[in-house]
Amino acid sequence: MADLYLVRHGQTELNVQSILQGWHDSPLTARGREQALTARTAFAARGVAFDHVYSSPLGRARHTAELIVGEGRSIELVDDLREWHFGSLEGTSNREMPPQPWGDYPVAFGGESEVQLQSRMVAALSRIMARPQHDCVLAVSHGSVCQEFLEYVTGGGELPDNGAVLHFGYCDGAFSLLGW
């Protein structure tokens, strides 16, 4: 069984302000950088050595991945690991959004549906894990993406905190949750 460690990026300036980010970007806060370094320390203490590292191309995820694996390590940027696209809703206050689940709500604003998000994420992680010699993989992504993947694997899921690490097993094309 192969291991997939799916990490939500560290806290950002817009997280602190409760602003819906989507594909908009925002730098990590000091706390966000600390969350990434804490994950790095935890992986090292457990002897986890990644053979491949992937990240959303958005700066907050890429920076989190860089802090986790250190300088000089190759990180493959994968567009399909990006956050849920909310269209023109991006940049608005989370308080202005209806309660979750949002389903197709963002579609009316030029965004993608929840089904599209989950399909995109599952396909991306399945392609990654099906590659040869992918026994221990780090993928850094975003809150809604992690939540949707967790729901796909377990049938339910809540929004992981910034810096959260979700550990999945992958065998014969199927994922299982091993730890969170």
Give each language-model segment a name.
Residues 37-98:
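Phosphate-coordination/substrate-recognition cap region in phosphate-metabolizing enzymes
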Residues 6-62, 110-121:
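Loop-to-helix element that buttresses phosphate recognition and phosphoryl-transfer chemistry
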Residues 10, 56-58, 80, 140-144:
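Short, well-ordered beta-to-alpha junction loops that form the rim of enzyme active sites
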Residues 42, 67, 71, 127, ...:
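Active-site catalytic microenvironments for nucleophilic, acid-base chemistry
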Residues 45-49, 128-136:
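Glycine-rich phosphate-binding loop signature in dinucleotide/nucleotide-binding domains
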Residues 4, 133-144:
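Generic beta-sheet signal
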